[in-house]
Amino acid sequence: MKEANTRRYIHLCLVVVLVSTIITTEAEDDRLFCIRHHKYCGHRPNRCCSGLFCRCNTFGTNCRCQSKGALGKLISGK
């Protein structure tokens, strides 16, 4: 009985660590794992760092994280 409780406790601890790691990773995702300015973003267009967005050429290629232009800033209010 004591051995079974110990296994359950260890299992519960592992689950708590895993869940907290996932939550922390999602929270830090924007800062640590974002795509920086002028870097390629075609494979993950929503991963540009804060204040940037993925902009591609007319043919949908050569996508790069760039800041919004003056008109884009005016429209979004940021």
Swiss-Prot record:
Disulfide bonds join 34-49, 41-54, 48-65, 56-63. Coiled coil: none annotated. The keyword Disulfide bond applies. It comes from the Eukaryota. The transcriptomic profile of the venom glands of S.tulumensis shows that the injected cocktail of toxins is dominated by enzymes (mostly proteases S1 and chitiniases) and that it includes this probable paralytic neurotoxin. Belongs to the xibalbin-13 family. This is Xibalbin-13 1.
